[in-house]
């Protein structure tokens, strides 16, 4: 039993780390880190009312990262994962844009201004994530036949 666990461990580790090297894995990891930094900036300000957006988006991105890393998305087939990921990133884009504009207009304190600027950066990051995960863009098309046709 110990030999089989030892032999399967590198395969499991390879499967878990292979997603983190993809564009989507790096993007999800960057979203988590950026949400954490924004959360720290909002927590350092006098009012931390806007920090809930960072917490929720960080948790959602971490859950999707775990699901994709452990290949759980292929085992749970009743959820349409591309649309789920697209709507998560689209909603985050809209909410970060609104929150950042409100915070920058209020402009009370340097940590809130930094959080607002980082929120605009998060808007771009989540918007890019929504762009690359748009499910209709990823549909495959069948190739046209290239055989010569008999004709005049």
Curated annotation (Swiss-Prot):
Show the GO MF annotations: chemokine binding
Per the record, membrane topology reads: Multi-pass membrane protein
Where would you find this protein in the cell? Membrane
Output the Gene Ontology cellular-component terms. Answer: plasma membrane
Where's it mainly located?
A: membrane
Task: Give TM regions.
Answer: 25-45, 48-68, 85-105, 112-132
Domain (MARVEL) ranges: 19-138
Q: Which residues form the signal peptide?
A: none
Q: Which Pfam families match?
A: MARVEL
Q: Which PROSITE patterns match?
A: MARVEL
Q: Which keywords does the record carry?
A: Membrane, Transmembrane, Transmembrane helix
User: What's this chain's function?
Assistant: May play a role in cell differentiation in the intestinal epithelium.
**What name does this protein carry?**
Proteolipid protein 2
């Amino acid at each position: 039993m110990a030999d089989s666990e030892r032999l399967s461990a590198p395969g499991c580790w390879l499967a878990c780390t292979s997603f983190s090297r993809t564009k989507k894995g790096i993007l999800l990891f960057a979203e988590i880190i950026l949400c954490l930094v924004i959360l720290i900036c909002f927590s350092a300000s006098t009012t931390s009312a806007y920090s809930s957006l960072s917490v929720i988006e960080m948790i959602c991105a971490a859950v999707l990262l775990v699901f994709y890393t452990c290949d759980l998305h292929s085992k749970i087939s009743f959820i349409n994962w591309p649309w789920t990921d697209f709507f998560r990133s689209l909603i985050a884009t809209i909410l970060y844009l609104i929150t950042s504009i409100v915070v920058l207009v209020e402009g009370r304190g340097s940590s809130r201004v930094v959080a607002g600027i980082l929120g605009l950066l998060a808007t771009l990051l989540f918007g890019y994530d929504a762009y690359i995960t748009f499910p209709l863009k990823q549909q495959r098309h069948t190739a046209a036949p290239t055989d010569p046709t008999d004709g005049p």
